[in-house]
């Protein structure tokens, strides 16, 4: 899987950086949100707890997808702005079990 950053912009009103990316996955299945998140964290040298992959849109029959991610400046802003279901899909299973 290869990820290319298409656009990166600051959003000072919401204290976050917004990233549009393209994901190429020739001969592989569509990547999961957590796989993309981990790759973006490594590429952007970001804190894994502050990066949220909002969506991944796949073209029919194409080995590529476009996506939208956000990097927040603080965990408080992330929980204040993002809906709970988006936070949940960006959390690994082991972290969810620890919270219960």
Curated annotation (Swiss-Prot):
It comes from the Archaea. InterPro entries: Nucleotide-bd_a/b_plait_sf, Ribosomal_eS24, Ribosomal_eS24_CS, Ribosomal_uL23/eL15/eS24_sf. The keyword Ribonucleoprotein applies. One of its GO terms (molecular function) is structural constituent of ribosome. Coiled coil: none annotated. One of its GO terms (biological process) is translation. Keywords: Ribonucleoprotein, Ribosomal protein. Belongs to the eukaryotic ribosomal protein eS24 family. This is Small ribosomal subunit protein eS24. The lineage of its organism: Archaea, Methanobacteriati, Methanobacteriota, Methanomada group, Methanobacteria.
